[in-house]
Amino acid sequence: MNKNKNLTINQTFELAVQKHQKNNLQVAESLYDKVLKVDPNHMGALNNLAILFQALGEDQKAKIYYEKAIKLKPNHAIAHNNLGIVFNKLGEDQKSKSCFEKAIKINPNHADAHNNLGNILKQLGEDQKAISCFEKAIKINPSYVNAHYNLANVFNRLGESQKAISCYKKVIEIDPNFTEAYWNLHVATSNIDESLSILKKLYKIDNKNTKAKIMMSVLQGYKGNFNEFNNLLASSDSNHPYTRSIKWVFSLPKLPKIFFNRWDFFDAVIALSENSRPFYEFGVSKGISFQYIINTFKKGFGFDTFTGLPETWDARSKGSFSNFGSVPKIEGGEFIVGKFEDTLPEFFSKERPKASLINFDADLYSSTLCALNYSNKVIDEKTILVFDELIMHKNWEKDEYRALNEFCDNLGFGYEVIVVSFLTWQVAIKLKK
């Protein structure tokens, strides 16, 4: 570094930028530090150090330097946007949202800020506002592939399948190698042959995509050809959670109906249910599924703390799926707030109407078993039980699946699997009491 000893501040900064661009981050950091020792208010060094630390995943340091840069230049839209990204990674959603809003106020044509704000709003359950943000980003930049993709995902989550399909196709038109769009497009379809065709295109682009390979074998199985799946069972993918899940389904006495997304799945279940009865849902979160189901049944009972998971589950941390204590306002919905072990004994101590369907979306073994035990009073031969995460995830045999089988073993019940949606992890059954 001695040869850099007599460089001016500007020369040192320019050298730091060169090292930064060549991904020599350690040297770049040292040079930016030298600039700041001479000039603590050097905007370029502050901003670039923030970018450098952000790239390294050192978000707390990145936050400090972005805040210093913004203090010097409050109208720096890019810095506000980048700080918003950092806050999002740190789990500070409201601060993240505020940063993106500031970036947009400074520069209304900042497409990235509109897209990022849309993602935060989606995380907060404000889907309609998120849609508006993604559409604004696309209006600014019609070829903004991530905005099209994010818009598709919101439509998919809301059950607007045709809009989602149109957006996924637009993503693929812009970027034919966008594999996630192919994957989600095949989920949004409702036809085995069409879904299989999409997966084949995906696999042609990425022949190491294990999930695509497994799902192609499933669809072939549903068409009567189990050769590919049998090959999977003899391969290194035999212990993949998808393979284990499908093996269980294929071992059932009767192959259940298959659907590709939660809304087609729910439509099929609702069509088989007693619509004159109310439904029950254990695990409401933001109420998206509850709202969809109640459009048919008009009356529903929902149980949740509305503060998220009580403990870590799968790859989700404690507090995931939180609605921040806010109870959804849904016409016809009656919500019982609190932990199942606290609220269910009192609720079911009174006579309750038999259930048309019960949606178990509690994820955890203990919570699901608790809900099953207490809701048994409203279950009869006509009730359909839906388990929202029964299969496909890493430890599926230890959670809702375990709770269901333990519940049935304890009471001497059997069950018939009637509908399955592999890609949304959902299974619908009827008990045989």
Enumerate the language-model features and the residues they cover.
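Short coil turns that delineate tetratricopeptide repeat
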Residues: 6, 40, 74, 108, ...
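Conserved alpha-helical positions within TPR/SEL1-like repeat arrays
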Residues: 13-21, 44-55, 78-89, 112-123, ...
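S-adenosylmethionine/decaboxylated-SAM
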Residues: 274-433
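Alpha-helical segment of the N-proximal tetratricopeptide repeat
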Residues: 7-38, 51-55
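Class I SAM-dependent methyltransferase Rossmann-like catalytic core
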Residues: 221-276
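TPR-repeat structural position
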Residues: 25, 59, 93, 127, ...
